[in-house]
Curated annotation (Swiss-Prot):
GO terms for molecular function: DNA binding; DNA ligase (NAD+) activity; metal ion binding. The keyword DNA repair applies. InterPro entries: BRCT_dom, BRCT_dom_sf, DisA/LigA_HHH, DNA_ligase, DNA_ligase_AS, DNA_ligase_CS, DNAligase_adenylation, DNAligase_N. It catalyses: NAD(+) + (deoxyribonucleotide)n-3'-hydroxyl + 5'-phospho-(deoxyribonucleotide)m = (deoxyribonucleotide)n+m + AMP + beta-nicotinamide D-nucleotide. It is an enzyme of class 6 (ligase). Its EC number is 6.5.1.2. This is DNA ligase. SMART domains: BRCT (SM00292), HhH1 (SM00278), LIGANc (SM00532). Keywords: DNA damage, DNA repair, DNA replication, Ligase, Magnesium, Manganese, Metal-binding, NAD, Zinc. The lineage of its organism: Bacteria, Bacillati, Bacillota, Clostridia, Natranaerobiales. Coiled coil: none annotated. NAD(+) binds at D33, Q34, E35, F36, D37, S82, L83, E113, R136, E170, K286, K310. PANTHER family: CHROMOSOME TRANSMISSION FIDELITY FACTOR 18, DNA LIGASE. Zn(2+) binds at C404, C407, C422, C427.
């Protein structure tokens, strides 16, 4: 009986993987979705009934398992380096000239491939079985997200050969899947993702693998940094090997004999990029020959044998339907243009910021204007210019308000800023924005408390400030449209968990003007408890490196407000933590508080991320560039030019042999 069950399980797995490959890799399905689901359900039922036959390479792993507590950190034995960028033909020709000179090859062969806009992953297989999927992280240390990676249908759980191999590539979300996901989020009253890249990254970083399993993610491999027992001599041969192993390969990878052909390829895809079913933001060009790659080597940041041609920011024309004022959490009155919806760089743009009155006047944007817009860095929509030649004479200049458009309170420019601010701390618009900021990922990280939910809770009078979040009751939430018992429980659980956050996240969440995430960390480290910070004077604050007079004044002013004192009392009563963890207390090493540290090279006992965490836990700030303001330079193996610059500037250099004493 047991052998019959085992054979049935193995046959089902083989059949499911066959059809999975046909559908997700070859794009040539032979059975319907319903038939595929029936096979999967049968396998899951058998594995649950007979757990002794469960296997890490079973296709049932793709539906997602139990939620995780956190993602373990993993070190990349071969660093996942970033690529040098070229933004013009000249940049590509300069790259070609360097390659030709250093390899003594006048016409080296290149491989060009589309630069998919997604999340870089490292996949490790042992004996052909997927054993680890990790994010790039900072290039040396990433996160182990294996359960989530297994839900991506185009990533084989088992290769066609029993190889020990590492494969790197890009996980992404198609435009169609992105639109569907955002539609579903809108129907649930949740905030949409800004673009497909954020959607893919956000999905794969969910602690519950069942979430990415439902989000139709895809994957294209782009390199094989390690393979045991096989001799690959070129990038193009590696691509062919990946296809044979069962991966879906991007169909537009091309091999070229000249840089002129590469440039034509880049120009072609710059024009055709919008016609693809997924987002790309450039073209990656690699030297094909592995021996030549090895000969050129890499800097501490980039391989010398590859470059990324970055497309210019995508632009589009639209019409200004309206201009209105948005009131931010610190009272800033920001002019926003309401546009005829237009699609740019993976998302539909309906609004763009003009930042302040001066920029509005400088660009002379009027209601009814035809404008050119783009996404700055392909992220933030901005108005590039007005098409003055398209004006009809009916366009209306915008009259900037002298008071807050929401609460009608006085608006002022503080300290000659370009920004006009509402000075009423009780302004409803500010209150809502403060709550949204407070619950954001970098602050208290309250899952499910996005803009639309905050708007709903505020409009129903359930919350008026950030402290009210902690006094919400299940029956209040369950009675709201779009909420049920389960969603109410989930939100309340996320709120309860946020009470345990360290002081620095609470401090950042309070939204004090000029206090960003890094400043909040420095202040929390120095003062240890909110009560101590509330007593601080300007001179106490400016003693801390990176805390200037303007920020110090803003902090002291914030804690002098009666509104702030009432808020803190409510947060304390709710049980919100106001203390920084003891292991980060300054007593561990006060000599490093506020110091600037640069790390260069590689270290035997630490990854770069681990060193950064240790140093920042002691109150220092890790920066990437050596300057006269740098206090210490930590030097490992193969340090590059940073060591030389540190010596020229007479800076304190900490060798790896002295690292333990330093820490």
């Amino acid at each position: 009986m047991s052998k019959d069950i085992q054979k049935k399980v193995e046959a089902l797995r083989e059949k499911i993987e066959y059809h999975n490959h046909r559908y997700y890799v070859l794009d040539a399905p032979e059975i319907s979705d319903q038939e595929f689901d029936a096979l999967m359900n049968e396998l899951i039922e058998l594995e649950q009934t007979y757990p002794e036959y469960q296997s890490p390479d079973s296709p049932s792993q793709r539906v997602g398992g139990e939620p995780l507590d956190k993602f373990p950190r993993v070190s990349h034995e071969i660093p996942m380096l970033s690529l040098e960028n070229a933004e013009s033909q000249k940049g590509l020709l300069d790259f070609h000239q360097r390659v030709s000179k250093n390899t003594q090859k006048t016409d080296p062969v290149y491989v060009a491939e589309l630069k998919i806009d997604g999340l870089a992953l490292s996949l490790r297989y042992e004996q052909g079985i997927l054993v680890r999927g990790a994010t790039r992280g900072d290039g040396t240390t990433g996160e182990d997200i294996t359960p989530n990676v297994k839900t991506v249908r185009s990533i084989p759980l088992k290769l066609s050969k029993p190889l020990d191999i590492e494969i790197r590539g890009e996980a992404f979300m198609s435009k169609a899947s992105f639109e569907r996901l955002n539609q579903e989020k809108a129907e649930r009253g949740e905030d949409p993702f800004a673009n497909p890249r954020n959607a893919a990254a956000g999905s794969l970083r969910q602690l519950d693998p069942k979430i990415p399993a439902k989000r139709d993610l895809d994957f294209f491999p782009y390199s094989v940094p390690y393979i045991r027992g096989e001799n690959l001599d070129s990038h193009y041969s590696a691509v062919k090997e990946l296809k044979d192993l069962g991966f879906k390969i991007n169909p537009y990878i091309r091999k070229f004999e000249t840089m002129e052909e590469v440039i034509s390829y880049c120009e072609e895809w710059q024009e055709k990029r919008t016609k693809l079913p997924y987002e790309i933001d450039g073209v990656v060009i690699k030297l094909n020959d592995y021996n030549l790659q090895q000969q050129l080597g890499a800097t501490s940041k980039n391989p010398r044998w590859a470059i990324a041609y970055k497309f210019p920011a995508e632009q589009a024309e639209s019409q200004v339907n309206n201009i209105f004022i948005n009131v931010g959490r610190t009272g800033a009155l920001t002019p926003v243009v309401e546009l005829e919806p237009v699609r740019i760089a993976g998302s539909t743009v309906k609004r763009a910021s003009l930042h302040n009155e001066d920029i509005l006047r400088q660009k002379d944007v009027r209601i009814g204007d035809r404008v050119i817009i783009q996404k700055a860095g392909d992220i933030i929509p901005e108005v590039v210019k007005v098409k003055e030649e398209a004006r009809t004479g009916h366009e209306q200049p915008f009259v900037y308000p002298e008071s807050c458009p929401v609460c009608k309170s006085e608006a002022k420019r503080i300290n000659d800023e370009a920004i006009l601010r509402c000075i009423n701390p009780g302004c409803p618009a500010q209150a809502k924005e403060r709550i949204i900021h407070f619950s954001s990922r970098d602050a208290m990280d309250i899952e499910g408390l996005g803009e639309k939910v905050v708007e709903k809770l505020y409009s129903h009078g359930l919350i008026k400030d950030v402290a009210d979040i902690y006094y919400l009751a299940k029956n209040e939430l369950s009675n709201l449209e779009g909420f049920g018992d389960k969603s109410a429980e989930n939100l309340l659980q996320a709120i309860e968990e946020s009470k345990k956050n360290p002081f620095n996240k609470l401090l950042y969440g309070l939204g004090i003007r000029l206090v960003g995430k890094r400043a909040a960390q420095l202040l929390a480290f120095e003062f240890e408890h909110l009560d101590n910070l509330m007593k601080a004077q300007i001179e106490d604050l400016t003693k801390i490196n990176d805390i200037g007079p303007r920020m110090a004044t803003s902090i002291v002013s914030f804690f002098q407000l009666e509104h702030t004192h009432n808020l803190i009392r409510k947060l304390k009563k709710a049980g919100v933590n106001m203390k920084e963890p003891t292991e980060q207390n300054k007593s561990s090493d006060p000599s490093l508080t506020g110091k600037l540290v640069v790390i260069t090279g590689t270290f035997d006992n630490y990854t770069r991320r681990e060193l950064t965490d240790l140093i920042e836990a002691k109150g220092a700030k890790v920066t990437s560039n050596v300057s006269s303001n740098t206090d210490f330079v930590l030097v490992g193996a193969n340090p590059g030019s940073k060591r030389d610059k540190a010596q020229d500037l007479g800076l304190t250099i900490i060798e790896e042999s002295d690292l333990e004493d330093f820490l």
